[in-house]
């Protein structure tokens, strides 16, 4: 048993003597040095980005704060536009309702050119009967006169433009 241990120890000694540790460790050291150099470059780049970002933030925040009045005006204009869009939507609904009533009064169901021109004329000729007129549920006429739908005025929401003021003078 003692001889086996000595044989094994000699074999291991030969392996250790034949192994060139410097040859195996040098590539690892080189890789570690490369990684440290890259890490240093990254740290420098990160510091540069931080400094630039801080400078930009300081300059831009001051500029943005300088536009506060303009932002308030823009906000007021956007609010006016939203109100205008709401009123336009309501006006459009009223105009559509008025058109529907007019189509009912003229008995228009055919939207071709022929239908739009001839059908109302035929309906007027055949509608001389008063019972037909009394059966119509709604009308755009007040005292036999057409009443147009009142629509919005953009000046109410945006004011007159400088161009319109110049033309008015």
Curated annotation (Swiss-Prot):
GO terms for cellular component: BLOC-1 complex. GO terms for biological process: eye pigment granule organization. It comes from the Eukaryota. Component of the biogenesis of lysosome-related organelles complex-1 (BLOC-1) composed of Blos1, Blos2, Blos3, Blos4, Dysb, Muted, Pldn and Snapin. Interacts with Pldn. PANTHER family: BIOGENESIS OF LYSOSOMAL ORGANELLES COMPLEX-1, SUBUNIT 4, CAPPUCCINO, CAPPUCCINO. Component of the biogenesis of lysosome-related organelles complex-1 (BLOC-1) involved in pigment granule biogenesis. Belongs to the BLOC1S4 family. This is Biogenesis of lysosome-related organelles complex 1 subunit 4. It comes from Drosophila melanogaster. The lineage of its organism: Eukaryota, Metazoa, Ecdysozoa, Arthropoda, Hexapoda. The gene is Blos4.
